[in-house]
């Protein structure tokens, strides 16, 4: 299996830090987040990945190189404008990525083994798509809620209607790729594409993962690198 890693965003809420460095290369536990994501993808069996870059793209591409340091063959696609996650994935596919594949963000770190378990579950399920769901962090203004019935996504909804948030990880099969086109926007978002696929009768599996770690604001940047501060908040 291969992957698309979305690493084009600026991280506006992390300003002024991201005025100098793009969000995906900022650290968690002292290591660049996007590098941690690539290592987890390799552990999940992904030996090829397309990294979609945009804001300060050269810094991300210089850090990752050809991927040999992570055991992953890398290619790059550029997203010149922040036109959304579905647009980023479409650009990755146009650059040569082939479904079925995983779609991950370059700024979210999963619990050890969770990404590999998700990849294995998606492959075993054989469904056109899959969504990772989590209870922690819970749904909120920046995190889509997901309604689930017996392991299948039924709706991607407002946060108040479900205990599950989407966990920034998707499984994308070939049957689902046409739903990336014709979305309302910009921005063009994967949540809308998957909802259209569900409404069109496609089965989207849901797999729960543990708490995730990401960088939303400068306070996160401090707490995720000095964990004793997180315990005292």
Region annotations inferred by a language model:
Residues 2-5, 13, 27, 31-105, ...:
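Conserved N-terminal catalytic core of the sugar/cofactor nucleotidyltransferase
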Residues 10, 21, 56, 211:
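A generic "binding-loop/recognition-motif" signal
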Residues 25, 145-148, 206:
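A structural signal for short hydrophobic beta-strand segments in well-ordered beta-sheet cores
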Residues 102, 109, 116-119, 123, ...:
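Catalytic-core segments of class I nucleotidyltransferases/pyrophosphorylases
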Residues 129-146:
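Short beta-strand-to-loop element that shapes/binds the nucleotide-sugar donor at the catalytic cleft/hinge
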